[in-house]
């Protein structure tokens, strides 16, 4: 009798995943990678686990900046707060701030204000501006402001001069001093003028010896312009305040004029601290100079108030023009070097002990415009968001580290560093926000949630942030009001594309640990239909293996999602699969 054809049984496979390799938003994933995650962490790698709950410390009013010092510092509603307490520095303008730490001081930009965290009475403006319309007296003096008592002004040498007589040669505009022991006149190398006026003590309160200032309105033209104050003070009465400048006047004279003294800071796009100076950069049109400027600056050594102190000393302030075109996009102190970024440049300054600082240029991926706050040092590596990817930089050329984020376009990145982790909040092309975490030690990315972070700051054993809802949050939950419920999820990529035949998924074995009242649900999607099918629920406490039977369904490919609440650790996921024919 004829033999009938026999049907061959399908091949059954058991696939176990016990190493979870983080987030990878790509079409093809390696074993253990996840296409999407919510509120998971790499802390327990190779396990998959939910992150710690965050703690909300406060809801702020008009927050404007965040700074990491010994205590958390921030601006809210126009006031600087240190360790959650308001300081005397109030009246700050609305909007985003750059808070820069220099020693015990906090410098606030663009307001150009400062506050001393060790002396609460020491605060105010970095700039100073004073003017007077009235009588001003000019007197030749020494560097200490002591007037010359025997000063002769003439076109020829005085007859029978006494020892120590000063003579202003009107023809040559030089000052000579007579020595009776040598019988000769010797030129005085530097001549000073004491400028005395009535300021009611305002000038000594606003300015100090060593300030670099802009002076206008003095009757002696040589005393106007950018000047160095060799002395500032007041006589026995506050109506007789004075400054000491380099310059020559023909004896003690008094004029009536309108005088103005200004100590000014340049307008700067970004400001950082490095090697006991503040450094800044500026690109844009200067309405005073009527030209576009493209410059970097630094303050005088140890003096954040002085940016126009030019005495030929190693401690002077400094400025340099830059040839590369385009706006500045960020700045950071990287390994003791002031480092400034454009979208296609990295400019690094080598600080010199002699004051001859050197500006170097590297043509490469720089910081994306709007992502200045993505700059973070983790370990000794600098991370930042470029126009195309997330970069790691160690002084040579940047290396991309964000292939796992897929081909999405992100902007407005804000970064934070905690331990070996790089936190990065940024917006995608659909205007949705994402908080990613890159574990630099393990080389793994994870996506936490949609938190829109305005600024990060690490203080002690906590990473703080201010979000778009003005909440001051402890990311590791060490303080504040903890989240009531932590929802988490993981989603695989497309599974079993390597098998061309149709297949059946019959069961899942999931080994996990769950805290009390934690739950988890399993969902399946078949053949990219876009719909998730509820395939089982897990509700248990402690560690154990849960078997989830799946109703067999023939498909070409599939995806799986696990979503739940509460603290969970997943040790492994085993899948039983039967591969059939291609029909």
Predicted feature residues:
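Beta-sheet repeat architectures centered on beta-propellers
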Residues: 2-71, 366-370, 377-381, 388-583
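Small/polar beta-strand repeat architecture
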Residues: 9, 126, 132, 143-144, ...
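Beta-strand-rich domains and repeat architectures in extracellular enzymes and scaffolds
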Residues: 51-76, 265-273, 325-329
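Short hydrophobic/aromatic-rich beta-strand motifs
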Residues: 72-73, 104-108, 158-177, 210-215, ...
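Structural motif
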Residues: 78-81, 114-120, 286-302, 344-350, ...
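Short, surface-exposed terminal/edge motifs of secreted or surface/virion proteins that either
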Residues: 79-84, 112-128, 165-189, 228, ...
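Extracellular/surface-exposed low-complexity repeats and stalk/linker segments enriched in Gly/Pro
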Residues: 88-95, 140-166, 190-193, 405-414
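Beta-propeller and closely related beta-pinwheel folds
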Residues: 264-416
